[in-house]
Amino acid sequence: MGLIWGLFSVIIASVAQLSLGFAASHLPPMTHLWDFIAALLAFGLDARILLLGLLGYLLSVFCWYKTLHKLALSKAYALLSMSYVLVWIASMVLPGWEGTFSLKALLGVACIMSGLMLIFLPMTKQRY
């Protein structure tokens, strides 16, 4: 069950990251504090997506807490790397994100996935 909670945490955190990225690219920069506050108070789509991203992170932390009750930290922590993979893929697939494909990034994703497989695949006992 810990693995399920961990996957929920990763998926929710990835969606939250995409939401925050969208909001950050559409809201005024925080260096223009009054414009930023005015945009938040107007509670338009950008501000609502920012709020959803922040709430998503909060929900992700709850799922992560549940994960750590059921799964060893050494395994649970490795799951977090899947968020990088999900956000990378989503940025290329979703319209408007302009994520770029590169062989270097693909190699990095392959390394992450290989590492996860090494950590999570069951160990087999060898007979001598």
UniProtKB/Swiss-Prot annotation:
Family matches, as Gene3D superfamilies: 1.10.3730.20
Location(s), subcellular: Cell inner membrane
TM stretches of this protein: 3-23, 36-56, 77-97, 101-121
One GO location term (cellular component): plasma membrane
Disulfide bonds: none
Cytoplasmic side: 1-2, 57-76, 122-128
Primary location group: membrane
GO terms assigned for molecular function: carbohydrate derivative transmembrane transporter activity
Topological domain ranges for the Periplasmic compartment: 24-35, 98-100
The keyword Glycosyltransferase belongs to this UniProt entry's keyword annotation: no
Membrane topology qualifier: Multi-pass membrane protein
Subunit structure: Heterodimer of ArnE and ArnF.
Similarity remark: Belongs to the ArnF family.
NCBIfam families found in the cross-reference section: PRK02971.1-2
The protein's name in its UniProt record: Probable 4-amino-4-deoxy-L-arabinose-phosphoundecaprenol flippase subunit ArnF
Species: Escherichia coli O9:H4 (strain HS)
